[in-house]
Amino acid sequence: MVSLNSVGLSGTKKIADIGALAIHGHRNGWGMLNRHPLLGIEFAAYQKIWRLAGVDQIHVNGIQNKFWESDDSVVRSIEACLKPMFGGFSVLPVVSSGQWGGQAPETYRRTKTTDLLYMAGGGIMAHPGGPANGVLALQQAWEGAVNGLSVEQAASQYPAFAQSVKKFGTK
């Protein structure tokens, strides 16, 4: 993982040029670049710059996130990442911001894709049935989302996900 705004463009490019590892770009500090119209850059342009530097994955925040960014902005960011550049290359959007399975239905409904990395550390590790059930709950949530189920419908069908809803449902 490279903290893009700290390492900078030339540092990120150098890291990408050194090895064959996937470069996971974290945009910590993004808020300072985007929260005021006179200070920054839209994510659609921002992610292109980092793609040119060699980033393979980039954070886009998340639906119903813990920060200030609107869901509409997150959706635009995901769409920008998936738009091919230079012969079909895209960058993998990393959905991460207080994620658990409960955001999967809305994320899928709004983006119509599973071509993303869905980071849910707390949603996995804090699951009442332990981390294995946390992973299972996420799988169940996404299966339900792809099948058009609401959170409530998926919870009634999938026991591990139901436990997540009980624990995280108000978050």
Question: Would you name each region that the model predicts?
Answer:
Residues 130-171:
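Extended, intrinsically disordered, low-complexity segments
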Residues 1-120, 129-133:
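Catalytic alpha/beta core domains of metabolic enzymes, predominantly
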